[in-house]
Amino acid sequence: MTFKGFSKKDFKTMQIPGLDARMAGIQNDIQPKFKAVGEELTTYLSAKLGDEMFLHIARHQRRSVNPPESTWLAICHDKRGYKKHPHFQVGLFDNYLFIWLAFIYENEESTKIANRFLKEKKLLAELPDTFAISPDHTEEKTYPVHGGQLDATLKRFRDVKKGEFLVGKIYLPDDNHLSPGKDFIKEAEMVLDELIPLYKAALQ
């Protein structure tokens, strides 16, 4: 499909009651956009990183009762799976779109990564003021990257078994960057450029 951007309808899809109905909306309306966006950004990241990257689209297969509160695509260097590795995400809650560099609780190097970011503060200090962080990919709550929560979030990621660290940028449903499609792709590439140094540091 030709990607025309994200619309307010996409956010409303994440409010549809019921597992089956919401999953139908995600599969019919959102996932085709994820595939189109993801293929472009995967190609972009592969070229930028000099390493083949692979697209994964969340299937929510473990869901049996409650509908997913968010949905996403992930881009990772591992073709078989992304959750245990640093990876990039683009996804939606019902009230914002996110572009994250994500380290979720399955990550096997959380101690090393958190300690590196805590020690080498310049890596995160240089991020734009418009960026945000999150301690949990399943929760909507985010904090400004320079808002005073950074160290606590990194320490939780390091010390708590289910701790996570996500950093990037969020967009409200009426943000002009979400459409047309070419504008969103350009914006996403700019965000990824800011996150690539962190990604590389995490893999060292």
UniProtKB/Swiss-Prot annotation:
SUPFAM superfamilies according to UniProt: YktB/PF0168-like
Gene3D superfamilies referenced in this protein's UniProt entry, alphabetically: Protein of unknown function DUF1054
InterPro entries per the UniProt record, alphabetical: UPF0637, UPF0637_domain_sf
Family per similarity comment: Belongs to the UPF0637 family.
Listed name of the protein: UPF0637 protein lin1053
Source organism: Listeria innocua serovar 6a (strain ATCC BAA-680 / CLIP 11262)
Lineage: Bacteria, Bacillati, Bacillota, Bacilli, Bacillales
